[in-house]
């Protein structure tokens, strides 16, 4: 089986524990207003590479000495668009005692295909889940997609018991609503498998790609978020988690 690969980063340090090989898959159904990789949206691209599990393993092996406390992370694009390939990839790596991390929005989750998702999670060591917004209407505006599949996927990870880290990007005037952060925390409090929450400050470093691709940037004029704003959001999310767990 081959996967549609956008790129491979051999020395990733922010996509899971330790040093990791990070595989960026091509294709994503979401159109997040602040996405910094719009070149991964389309399933086909002139730059897409088709790689087998064995080819990715060979690439991992060449740098394995650096991955002692790390492993492999698959992200995107949206990794779940190629769930069969990711399942095969993770199975292969787990059989060789490599830590596997799935970085996803969860948007592709379909409860009617739960067996396939459970199979993937059975060979996943860690899930990093990006929750863009907890308000359904705001989420639809921000991403072009509904919120419920994402929450459903989060609940499934809890049911399976896979450790989960949650990320949320704080965008000034867009996702910096304290009430929404509290509600996000209240939902996360229901996930017994939650290990970490990270509210990240929005940045504008990806805007040049939009100009290159001829795509209008919907957040034009909105400034980057400060670290203080992101830290404040994290504190509010934690308050919501604690409130649920009282």
Predicted regions and their residues:
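Auxiliary Fe-S-binding modules of radical SAM enzymes
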Residues: 2-17, 170-246
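Canonical Radical SAM [4Fe-4S] cluster-binding loop centered on the CxxxCxxC motif
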Residues: 7-9, 13-51
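Conserved AdoMet/S-adenosylmethionine-binding subsite of the radical SAM
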Residues: 57, 61-71, 76, 80-200, ...
């Amino acid at each position: 089986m081959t996967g549609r690969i956008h790129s491979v980063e051999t020395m990733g340090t922010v996509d899971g524990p330790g040093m990791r090989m990070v595989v960026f898959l091509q294709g994503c159904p979401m159109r997040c207003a602040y996405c910094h990789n719009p070149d991964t949206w389309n399933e086909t691209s002139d730059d897409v590479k088709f790689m087998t599990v064995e080819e990715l393993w060979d690439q991992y092996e060449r740098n394995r000495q650096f991955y002692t406390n790390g492993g492999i992370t698959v992200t995107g694009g949206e990794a779940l668009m190629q769930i069969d390939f990711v399942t095969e990839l993770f199975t292969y790596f787990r059989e060789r005692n490599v830590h596997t991390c799935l970085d996803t929005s969860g948007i592709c989750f379909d409860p009617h295909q739960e067996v396939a998702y459970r199979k993937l999670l059975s060979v996943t060591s860690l899930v990093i889940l990006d929750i863009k917004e907890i308000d359904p209407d705001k989420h639809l505006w921000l991403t072009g997609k509904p919120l419920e599949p994402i929450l459903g996927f989060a609940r499934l990870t809890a049911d399976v018991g896979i450790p989960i880290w949650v990320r949320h990007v704080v965008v000034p005037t867009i996702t910096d609503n304290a009430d929404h952060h509290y509600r996000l925390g209240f939902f996360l409090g229901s996930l017994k498998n939650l290990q970490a929450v990270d509210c990240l400050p929005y940045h504008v470093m990806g805007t040049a790609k939009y100009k290159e691709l001829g795509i209008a940037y919907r957040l034009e004029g909105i400034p980057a978020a400060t670290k203080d704003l992101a830290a404040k959001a994290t504190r509010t999310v934690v308050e919501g988690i604690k409130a649920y767990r009282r």
